[in-house]
Swiss-Prot record:
Function comment: One of the essential components for the initiation of protein synthesis. Protects formylmethionyl-tRNA from spontaneous hydrolysis and promotes its binding to the 30S ribosomal subunits. Also involved in the hydrolysis of GTP during the formation of the 70S ribosomal complex.
Sequence segments annotated as region (G4): 563-566
Iron-sulfur in keyword set: no
Region ranges (G3): 509-512
Region of interest called G5, as start-end residue ranges on this chain: 599-601
Organism per entry: Streptococcus pyogenes serotype M49 (strain NZ131)
Full protein name: Translation initiation factor IF-2
Lineage of source species: Bacteria, Bacillati, Bacillota, Bacilli, Lactobacillales
Record's compositionally biased regions (Basic residues): 339-348
Family to which this protein belongs: Belongs to the TRAFAC class translation factor GTPase superfamily. Classic translation factor GTPase family. IF-2 subfamily.
Region named Disordered: 51-242, 279-363
Stretches assigned to the tr-type G domain: 454-623
Subcellular location: Cytoplasm
Protein's gene: infB
Pfam families, sorted: EF-G_D2, GTP_EFTU, IF-2, IF2_N
Length: 953
């Protein structure tokens, strides 16, 4: 909205700038001078107000200005008797206060009406200031006029008044004429004959009538005046409060300055006393020193004068300084040598016994009581710390029999002996290793006792193969996890969280196969409670005993869940008796272990099992501090083609947030994203919460600890340092040939080796597979793991296999198209598996030479899922298009997502449009269903293959 300046408004309406400024202030606008600007709406408001106020000027032919023309002019003439004063009052009025004018006019009208009565009412109405509703008042007054002749009387009265006023000034004659013409016009228009037209006639009363409007105007004027007084009182009270507050602030400031000045004066007095003491001490030393210096200068002066003078041929002696002497020494003994010094003419340079300037001495500093040192500190660093000269410390070391310079490093024993000589208690500084994240788990001061809260228990489910661990967890989570596991066994740790009775419980599902011993050990190390699953029909098995040993080693309580009690051959009592032999005694028998008989398949006694878990957790008093930086353990790690390194973490203390700088094992990074066990993104993870994170530089090892650092710089430094240490440790563990192991090395050359390269989907599977293959014992043959890593089989793996004559074993991963092509070219064998004991059996049979029939996998074709359709009571149908080869009805299929095999099974149905077909060829579309798998997604790759038996050469 545009703005206008006040002087422009004044020029537009023909008023002075001062009047416009005062009226703008009266309206409540924030203006200061004629140069101030106001909004367009406020400018229109000011112009309209002035136009209303100046309306009598426009109709000058009809009315007379009440205050500026008629009344003030008469008053001025009576008081001064001067025509010049009257003109001045009319032509140049003072600044107007509209509110005060309205109040004064209201009071004046009320007083005038009471004094003159009803006969002068019309004259006051015409002579007074026209209010906004004067027109309505005139109309109401016209109704009270009884006869048309009454208008004639009023007309004569107007003429008589005009004739009385006109001799005063020439302008007043013009006003009278206008009044008469206005009255005649009203008479002609019939404005005063309303009562006659209505046919009513009221008798004219001589007694004065009560003017209620005048009373109301007077009352309103009094109310306005009272409001003005109250506003002014409030304004003054506010100003007084502000003044008192400012005065209080000034007093507080002066008090603070006064206290500061007093403190400074005390300090100055103390410093002055110290300086006086030092001056007295120095004066005694200076006086003795100056006496000795003067005595030496008097003895040396005659020789110096002879050097500075020479004799001319006339025998006249002149003073001359030896400026050309390049060997002159400029020191204290020759301090009078000054090139710019001017001497008096004809006089020899003589020594003046002036007192030398006082030599500033080093201030005395007290020795510290304690000295914290580090190994390898230099003499200069020690001198700076204890505020002594390095030369003094070098001298002390020399007296102690140690030859050292100020830049030489000292060992801890020498530093302690030196501090003993000074009388200082020496302490070795304990340096905190920034790269050591294990200290967060061991340091009790890391947690804040006042912030300790109860946390959810971490429960690990252990047991033998196919005893129902994943089925139990599946029942708890109400999902079908077991159907997605190849071979019906769990391949790697899954971490899940459920809620029971308002409390959360975190479950870790560890594999039960013998190859996954290290994974079970890791699960036991981070758990709070162990649920030992034992099948009621099988009893105690080897992995059951191993799980018992892991739990006892970790010192965690054990809850025994006897599963499969719904089977006909179930015998829970036999299981209790067998477990008692290994120290697992039921509370019914006087032991400490809780036993619960369940059926995970039919959801029997599951609630009782969860109640037992919460009861044991309450007894254990599991606590955590969610306010500190997060620390915890890596449950699993894998390499994703699109996201990079993905690690499943279990937060044990603190709260993990997105964008936290983190060190995980020997790598570091920043948490870019966190996903919980339900696949939802979260911004934070509290204690006992499992999450998967991305953002790490490399894939960590399962079982590594992690810690959150204060900033990314510290995390980077710690991660790089840990990586260097791990590499150095690996190099140190490399065995070199010596005389002691020379015979063993030569003997090992006679043993044939089978070189393998292992690639798996997760780190835990890599470790388990490598450990299982190395443990295979066949006489004369051993397995050598050349390389093991997480991720898809790539070209570098094929190149390494060719160079080392190795076999590539892929576990739940697939080779890239380039790697497959290179393997065919270089004749490198790639074995792909999804069940770990199948790999072990195959390698073992190959080592023993018992592979009679050899089955070779033949790829029939590949297809891409373009659309999925979910049909109730049937499953998921995948609409696909063949991009290579063909897909047959009797072929096996693999579902590949991001180069990782997520399912391997048989086709349940194959259709081309609505017809069942035996095969779908290249570039054709069709629909398929896979047995026991409904998690098809768009862009999944379907690989069709068959197993062909080949004759071994």
């Amino acid at each position: 909205m545009s703005k206008k300046r006040l002087h422009e408004i004044a020029k537009e309406i023909g008023k002075s700038s001062k009047e416009v400024v005062e009226y703008a202030k009266y309206l409540g606008l924030d203006v200061k001078s004629h140069a101030s600007s106001v909004e367009e709406a406020d400018a229109k408001k000011i112009i309209s107000s002035f136009s209303k106020a100046s309306k009598p000027d426009v109709t000058a032919s009809q009315t007379v200005k009440p205050k500026e023309v008629a009344q003030p002019s008469v008053t001025v003439v009576k008081e001064t008797g001067s025509e010049h004063v009257e003109k001045t009052q009319v032509s140049k009025p003072k600044s107007r206060n509209f509110k005060a004018e309205r109040e004064a006019r209201a009071k004046e009208q009320a007083a005038r009406k009471q004094a003159n009565g009803s006969s002068h009412r019309s004259q006051e109405r015409r002579g007074g200031y026209r209010q906004p509703n004067n027109h309505q008042t005139n109309e109401q007054g016209n109704k009270r006029i009884t006869h048309r002749s009454q208008g004639d009387t009023n007309d004569k009265r107007i003429e008589r008044k005009a004739s009385n006023v006109s001799p005063r000034h020439d302008n007043h004659q013009l006003v009278g004429d206008r009044n008469r013409s206005f009255a005649k016009e009203n008479h002609k228009n019939g404005r005063f004959t309303n009562q006659k037209k209505q046919g009513r006639q009221e008798p004219q009363s001589k007694s004065p009538k009560i003017d209620f409007k005048a009373r109301a105007a007077a009352l309103k004027a009094e109310q306005n005046a009272e409001y003005s007084r109250q506003s002014e009182t409030r304004f003054r009270a506010q100003q007084e409060a502000k003044r008192l507050a400012e005065l209080a602030r000034q007093e507080a400031k002066e008090a603070a300055l006064k206290a500061q000045a007093e403190e400074m004066s005390h300090r100055e007095a103390a410093l002055k006393s110290i300086e006086e003491a030092e001056t007295k001490l120095k004066s005694s030393n200076i006086s003795a020193k100056s006496t000795a210096d003067n005595r030496r200068k008097k003895q040396a002066r005659p020789e110096k004068n002879r050097e500075l003078t020479h004799h001319s041929q006339e025998g006249q002696k002149k003073n001359k300084k030896s400026w050309n002497s390049q060997n002159q020494v400029r020191n204290q003994k020759n301090s009078n040598w000054n090139k710019n010094k001017k001497t008096k003419k004809g006089k020899n340079v003589k020594n003046t016994n002036t007192a030398p300037k006082p030599v500033t001495e080093r201030k005395f500093h007290e020795l510290p009581k304690e000295f914290e040192y580090t190994e390898g500190m230099t003499v200069a660093e020690i001198a700076k710390r204890i505020k002594r000269e390095p030369a003094e410390i070098v001298k002390k070391l020399f007296m102690m029999g140690v030859m050292a310079t100020q830049n030489q490093s000292l060992d801890g024993d020498t530093i302690e002996l030196l501090m003993v000589d000074y009388g200082i208690e020496a302490k070795a500084k304990v340096e905190v290793d920034n790269a050591d994240i294990e200290r967060f788990f061991e340091d009790e001061n890391y947690l804040n006792p006042e912030n300790i809260v109860e946390r959810a228990p971490v429960v690990t489910i252990m047991g033998h193969v196919d005893h129902g661990k994943t089925t139990l967890l599946d029942t708890l989570r109400n999902s079908r996890v077991a159907t997605g596991e190849a071979g019906g066994i769990t391949q790697h740790i899954g971490a899940y969280q459920i809620e029971e009775a308002g409390k959360k419980i975190t479950f870790l599902d560890t594999p039960g196969h013998a190859a996954f011993t290290s994974m079970r050990a890791r699960g036991a190390s981070v758990t709070d409670i162990t649920i030992l699953i034992v099948a009621a029909d099988d009893g105690v098995m080897p992995q059951t005993i191993e799980a018992i040993n892991h739990s006892k080693a970790a010192g965690v309580p054990i809850i025994v869940a006897i599963n499969k009690i719904d089977k006909p051959g179930a015998n829970p009592e036999r299981v209790i008796a067998e477990l008692a032999e290994y120290g697992i005694i039921s509370t019914a028998w006087g032991g400490e272990c809780e036993f619960v008989e369940i059926s995970a398949k039919f959801n029997k006694n599951i609630d009782e099992l969860l109640e037992t878990v919460l009861l044991v957790a309450e007894v254990e008093e599991l606590k955590a501090d969610p306010t500190v930086r997060a620390i915890g353990t890596v449950i699993e790690a894998r390499l994703d083609k699109g996201k990079g390194a993905i690690a499943t973490l279990l937060v044990q203390q603190g709260t993990l947030h997105v964008q936290d700088p983190i060190v995980v094992g020997n790598t570091f990074g920043r948490v870019r994203a966190m996903v919980n066990d339900l696949g939802r993104r979260v911004k934070s993870a509290e204690p006992s919460t499992p999450v998967s994170i991305t953002g790490l530089n490399e894939t960590p090892m399962a079982g590594d600890h992690f810690a959150v650092y204060a900033d990314e710089k510290a995390a980077r430094a710690a991660g790089e340092e840990r990586s260097k240490r791990a590499l150095l440790k690996q190099r140190q563990n490399t065995q070199r040939v010596s005389l002691d192991n020379l015979f063993d090395t030569l003997k090992a050359g006679e043993i044939k080796t089978v070189n393998v390269i292992i690639k798996a989907d997760v780190q835990g599977s890599v470790e388990a597979l490598a450990a299982s293959l190395v443990k295979i014992e066949v006489e004369g043959v051993r397995v050598n793991v050349v390389h093991s890593a997480v991720g898809a089989i790539n070209e570098s793996d094929v190149t390494l296999a060719e160079a080392s004559n190795a076999v590539i074993i892929g576990f739940n991963v697939r080779p890239t198209p380039q790697a497959r092509q290179q393997a065919d070219t270089d004749d490198v064998e790639i074995r792909l598996h999804s069940i770990i004991y199948k790999v072990i059996e195959e390698v073992e049979e190959a080592m023993k030479g018992k592979l009679d029939p050899v089955y070779q996998e033949k790829i029939l074709g590949e297809a891409i899922i373009r659309e999925t359709f979910k049909v109730s009571k049937v499953g998921t149908i995948g609409g696909f298009m063949v991009i290579n080869g063909k897909v047959t009805r009797d072929s096996s299929v693999r579902v590949i997502r991001d180069s990782v095999v997520i399912f391997d099974g048989k086709l349940a149905s194959l259709k081309h449009y609505k017809d069942d077909v035996k095969e779908v060829g290249n570039a054709q579309e069709g629909g398929l269903m896979i047995e026991n798998f409904n998690d098809l997604k768009v862009d999944d790759t379907i690989e069709a293959y068959i197993m062909e038996e080949i004759v071994r050469k």
